[in-house]
UniProtKB/Swiss-Prot annotation:
Residues 2-263 form the NodB homology domain. It comes from Aeromonas hydrophila subsp. hydrophila (strain ATCC 7966 / DSM 30187 / BCRC 13018 / CCUG 14551 / JCM 1027 / KCTC 2358 / NCIMB 9240 / NCTC 8049). InterPro entries: ArnD, Glyco_hydro/deAcase_b/a-brl, NODB_dom. It is an enzyme of class 3 (hydrolase). GO terms for cellular component: membrane. Coiled coil: none annotated. It catalyses: 4-deoxy-4-formamido-alpha-L-arabinopyranosyl di-trans,octa-cis-undecaprenyl phosphate + H2O = 4-amino-4-deoxy-alpha-L-arabinopyranosyl di-trans,octa-cis-undecaprenyl phosphate + formate. Catalyzes the deformylation of 4-deoxy-4-formamido-L-arabinose-phosphoundecaprenol to 4-amino-4-deoxy-L-arabinose-phosphoundecaprenol. The modified arabinose is attached to lipid A and is required for resistance to polymyxin and cationic antimicrobial peptides. GO terms for biological process: 4-amino-4-deoxy-alpha-L-arabinopyranosyl undecaprenyl phosphate biosynthetic process; lipid A biosynthetic process; lipopolysaccharide biosynthetic process; response to antibiotic. This is Probable 4-deoxy-4-formamido-L-arabinose-phosphoundecaprenol deformylase ArnD.
Amino acid sequence: MTEVGLRIDVDTFRGTRDGVPRLLQLLDKHQVKGSFFFSVGPDNMGRHLWRLLKPRFLLKMLRSNAASLYGLDILLAGTAWPGKSIGKQLGSLMRDTDSARHEVGLHAWDHHGWQANTGRWDEAELARQTRLGVDALNQILGREVDCSAAAGWRADPLTTQAKEPFGFRYNSDCRGSGLFRPLLQDGRPGTPQIPVNLPTFDEVVGHQVTVDDFNRFLLDQLATPPAQGQHVYTIHAEVEGIVMADQFDALLGEARARGIRFVPLGDLLPSDPTTLPTGRLVRGTLPGREGWLGCKAEA
């Protein structure tokens, strides 16, 4: 069997309420475990609407037919009214995920806030935002969270430094191939990073592949060895857990028939993480994604 890391981002109130239960059902049906990363604070995702003024973001929204893909409640969340508190109202679903023996980690306190402001926050504010999320998720689960995945892959050397004191087992904050330990400001290797190398649904549908051909496209990608390490794939509760749930169901079945086994990201870590190579986490760009994001680079 070929192991592929499965990262599941839960960005919004609706994704948690409607997408997570469906994903838990599908994953149980196919006997798959994955890594769920939850946003636990206010759902302000609708505040991204101002980015429609940016041509690349507008093109992405039109290409992916965002209104039907995500729903108007997601696209307007936190605009004309205060964003709903995801963790306070839907924490039981996070506990259900943990009880089902999936890996559970922090995505963000405020997904919109992190994605929109990471580039200008200082180290203290980055640490404060992480602490808000960690404390909330710890309280929800009744235990300490030991992994995280940056919202929108918005991460750079400063966020790497800010998250280091939290003692996570690993972070999944960037794009690239192969696990590594990012170098900190003093030259020491930091917490292991598990980069995502495969494209997400919204990054390729509409300009590189059609909706109906996406599963075939992804399975072809999985059949090709990555540049380094193992494949890591990200889905979103708002997409694969709601409007594309049937297609994701079919993908899980076809992958299993082809000898592909999805696993939590933590299963990809070696028994001794200090054996991982060092590298750098830097800002970069990626086709199909608007703005900058964290990328793996050579040390």
